[in-house]
C-alpha cells in the first residue's frame, strides 16, 4: 500500500472538456423577441441612420422571451446582408438591439446585453449559422446561436438567426476575464476611410504589414480602445517579419483550429477567403492575440467568389484544397504559419479530427435536418423571408439561385467533399500515437510523462490559467531531463508546478502530428492534488 503522505502528494490527471453552456435564450427551441418602436416610419428612420452613421439607434421597448427592457437601442446591422437586401427591396433586414442602451443595469438572466438578429442572407436553409457555430464550439470558443421569432409593433417579421455577441460577458465565460482589448476584424461601416493618407493599398483585415502608422489600418480593423493598436501592429510585424517569435504574440493553436474549420466547412466569407474578414482578436493581458470566428451565414459554400471575384464552380469548392492559400502572401496567417512544418502538421491533425467527427460520421447532416425540422413551421409562416418555402425545403440537396449567386445545397456540397477529403493524401499521413499521460510532483516542479510512438519530437503544452495561450516546451526520451531511460518511448518534461495548471501533449513525426486530447487546446488535462483521507 502507498503511504498516506504519498497519497496526499500524488496528482491525478483530469481531462477537462469545456461544458456545453445551455442558456435559456441561446438554448434549444425557437426563442421570441418583440420590439415596440413609437414611430410609424421607423424603418425609414433606421435606414437613414444606417446610411449616415451605422452606430446610431432609435429608442424602443424590447421583450426577450417575455422579459421587458425599456429604452432599448435599436438599429439595423450588417454590410452585405443589409445593403444588398435593401437594394433588392426586401423588408427583412438584420437588427441589433442594445438592451442596456439607456438603462445600464438591464441585461438578460445569463448576462447578455445585446441581441443580434440576422436575416439568413444567402442561406435558404436558415441553418448555416447555427450549424457551423455548433461544430466550431467543439474545438474553440465561439458564440452560441439559435433561432428567434421576431415581431415589430406586433407584426411578425419572420424567423431570424440569433447569435451571441462577442463582448465582456462572452470573454468572462470562456476566458475567466474581460480584461484586455477586443479588435473587430471587419468594421461595421465598410465604407469607412483610413485616417492616414498615402498608405499602401492593403486588403481588409488580412494582417498584412503596410507600415507602422495606425492610421493605415483603421479602415480594416475596429478597436474598443486606442491602446489595442499597439498590440495589433505588434502581431502584424511579428507575423510578417519575425515569424519564429509568433507564439509570443498569437495563440497559434487556436488560430490553426480557426483556419482548419474555415477550410473544412468551406467558410470562405472569412479570413481564408477573398474578403479576409469576419473574425475578432481578443488581446489578453500579456499581449497575446486569440482569434475568434464570427458571421457564418455563408459557411458550407455559401460564399464562392475567388480572389478575382469570379464564382467558383461546384468542383472547386467540393475539392477546396486543405492547404489553399499557403503560397498567398496576402494571407500571412495561412502562408506564414502553414509553411512551418510543425504548425502545418498540427493543422492537418486538427483538420482530420473535424472531418472524422462531423463529416465522416454524417453528424453535420443529422444536425442540419434536426434544426430544419424544428424551424419548419416558422419558416412557412415567414412572409418576408428572402427565399421561397420550396427553396428552404430543397436547400440541403439542391443549388438555389439568388441574384448573381448560386448557393449550393449543404448536403450536395458536403457529402462529395467528405468522400474527396477522406482520400486526400494529406489526411492519410502516419501520425504519432500518444497514451499513458501522467503527472506527479517533483520538488517545486511537476513532472509530466507520456508514451509516444512514431514521433521525432514530443512537446508539452502548458499554461497557468485559462485566460492564457499554452506555452510549448520540449519533452525528452534521452535518459536525462528527468527522463529515466533513454529511447523507451516514454517522454518527460518538468516545469514549475504553478505554471502547469492545464496541459496537453503534442507529438510530431516525420509525416504527421497528433495531440492528446485530440481536441486540444480546447480540451486539456488539469493537475489537481488528490483529496486527503479523513483521519
Label each residue range with its predicted role.
Residues 481-494:
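Aromatic sugar-binding surface patches on proteins
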